[in-house]
Regions:
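A long, amphipathic alpha-helix that forms part
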Residues: 238, 376-380, 417-461, 488, ...
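Active-site-flanking alpha-helical
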Residues: 263, 449, 471
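A short beta-strand-to-alpha-helix junction
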Residues: 312-319, 428-440, 480-489, 501-532, ...
């Protein structure tokens, strides 16, 4: 204990760097380098050494920089680095989660209910066990010779600063050289690979969560500008409404984590969508999301193509389709089982109610707070707007982990299930629970359709992102450059009521939808804006609708008009 108290802050930083950089990243090293023994090359050996050294040196560099704030502040900040890294290491070790912007955005969401569902007893025990030793070192050390103290002391400035700068160079230079080597391989093979430095930064603690946290903070500042700073398509372009839109109801269901390759209507071996399979007025597409986390997808899936930056945080540049419809005369209500208030306010909805508000309603007391409560809210909304030209947005929990909590016991069709986050579930158990949740999604969508079956209505559905459910990877939120394909697989659907199809133009558009669905034409999130406008019958003479993205666009129409 006397030694712990007496060592300098620089030595303590190095010891902590070894602990965080090597021990907490142990599972990542094993996965990245495990295959090297069977296919070893000199460059692979060099890269392994470089990455091992980089994780230690970058942590040392960070801890020394933090000591510029003084001894007391350093203790607090270093403790946070340890705790955050220990927490992240749990998911990296046991769930093989890549800690990127999507994960940080999900953790920092105001929707605590969903976030806490992936925190169990095992996580807490791991956090305590892994962080105890470094926290003891931090709080029992005198923290002598912080970088701030050394810079103020003549004779120590150059040497102390040189050590920090050298650590930074020793991280950057080897990684840069390996990046250059990789570029040469890319040119020789014609294979496009992600940046080597970017892969390393996203793979290891603490650089992965620190860089993601920095992006999240920047995005929050970026989002603080209101809708007036965003391009407004309703003002930039001319939108001509069809004659028969004033009595139309539009419903958009935002799904959560549901994958099309686990839905029976797309050929999945289990009949997870028995009710949707009976809908004759439904066109269902194999879709691909614009990102892998809710907060990111909500930024890019409802704007025109290019309406969100192609950067990690998906900076918004334009107003979304719901805000445009509001400005075109639609009344609108938004009901959510989540709490993405930044997005909800951007829709310009007349009425917004999220989970806590809905659950507090007297009619909902004692009821489980799940997606079916949104159907009750929808009924109330329809009753208040009997004349149509009304938009209802429903943001669901869908198939979000913990899957078993997404559906009532009566939908537990496939067993055994994955009961809890700490239960050590097998892949089969997780799939059983996931498929049960998809069946409940089927029930929910069908229930929504039932509310407008006798009205002139169109219902859209699109999940925000997919999910990884296998031995190597779980959950979602992986940076999209690194994400596996299943995190992008989302079902996208359009349903039109019989009354809506009484209009010949709408019937023709639906026939086009069915034709493309039968041909298994893949669809994308970035096509939703133009599709919603197009399927409602809006036209734009000055480019407000990209017909290439409009699923309801009939290619022969132009030829017929020309003749």
């Amino acid at each position: 204990m006397r030694y712990i108290k007496s060592i300098t802050q620089q030595k303590l930083s190095f010891l902590l760097a070894i602990y965080i950089g090597l021990f907490m990243n142990g599972a990542v090293f094993y996965r990245r380098f495990g295959s090297y023994a069977h296919d070893f090359t000199v460059w692979k050996g060099i890269s392994a050494v470089v990455e091992l050294a980089a994780t230690v040196l970058v942590t040392f560099f960070l801890l020394r920089l933090l000591s510029l704030f003084g001894r007391r502040s350093w203790r607090i900040l270093a403790s946070l680095v340890v705790l955050f890294s220990a927490g992240a290491s749990y998911y990296m070790t046991f769930l093989n989660v890549v800690i990127g912007y999507g994960i940080i955005a999900s953790v920092m969401t105001t929707d605590i209910d969903l976030s806490k569902e992936v925190v169990g007893l095992n996580f807490i025990l791991w956090l305590i066990a892994v962080s105890a030793l470094p926290l003891i070192l931090i709080w029992n050390n005198r923290c002598r010779y912080t970088l701030l103290r050394q810079l103020r002391t003549p004779g120590q400035r150059i040497r102390s600063l040189a050590v920090v700068v050298l650590a930074g160079i020793m991280v950057w230079a080897p990684i840069r050289l390996l990046d250059i080597q990789q570029k040469k391989v890319e040119r020789a093979t014609g294979v496009d690979l992600p940046s080597y430095g970017g892969i390393v930064a996203n793979s290891y603690l603490p650089s992965n969560w620190l860089s993601a946290l920095g992006l999240y903070a920047w995005a929050r500042v970026d989002e603080s500008s209101d809708n007036n700073s965003l391009l407004n398509p309703a003002k930039k372009f001319t939108y001509q409404a069809p004659q028969n839109v004033d009595d139309t109801y539009v419903v958009f269901i935002i799904g959560e984590t549901t994958r099309w390759d686990h839905m029976g209507i797309f050929g999945y071996e289990r009949n997870t969508t028995p009710k949707l399979a009976q809908e004759k007025n439904l066109a269902a597409f194999r879709g691909y999301s614009c990102d892998t986390a809710t907060k990111l997808s909500l930024r890019c899936m409802f704007v025109r193509q290019g309406g969100a930056e192609d950067n990690p945080q998906r900076t918004l540049k334009e107003q979304n389709i719901f805000a445009v419809l509001k400005q075109l005369g639609f009344s609108s209500d938004l009901y959510a089982m989540q709490s993405e208030m930044w997005f909800y306010s951007n829709t310009m909805a007349d009425n917004i109610a999220y989970r806590e508000q809905i659950g507090a309603e007297p009619r909902n007391r004692g009821k489980p707070v799940d997606d079916m409560l949104l159907v009750d809210e929808m009924q109330q909304s329809l009753g208040r707007n009997p004349d149509g030209k009304h938009l209802i947005i429903l943001h669901t929990k869908g198939s979000h982990f913990n899957y078993t909590q997404r559906y009532p016991r009566s939908f537990a069709q496939w067993k055994p299930e994955c009961i809890g986050v700490d239960s050590g579930c097998t892949k089969a158990q997780m799939i059983n629970s996931y498929d049960n949740s998809v069946t409940y999604v089927d029930h929910f969508i069908s229930s929504v359709i039932d509310q407008v079956r006798d009205k002139k209505a169109i219902v859209f559905y699109a999940a925000d992102h997919g999910e990884s459910i296998n031995e190597r990877e779980h959950l979602h939120g992986t940076p999209r450059e690194l994400a596996p394909p299943e995190q992008f697989r989302v079902p996208m659907m359009v349903w039109m009521s019989d009354k809506y199809l009484e209009n010949p133009a709408n019937a023709q558009a639906f026939a086009q939808l069915k034709k493309e669905a039968d041909m298994k034409v893949p669809r994308r999130h970035v096509e939703l804006y133009d599709t919603i406008m197009g399927c409602l019958g809006y036209t734009s003479p000055d480019g407000g609708i990209n017909e290439n993205n409009n699923w309801c666009h009939i290619p022969q129409a132009k030829e017929a008009a020309a003749n």
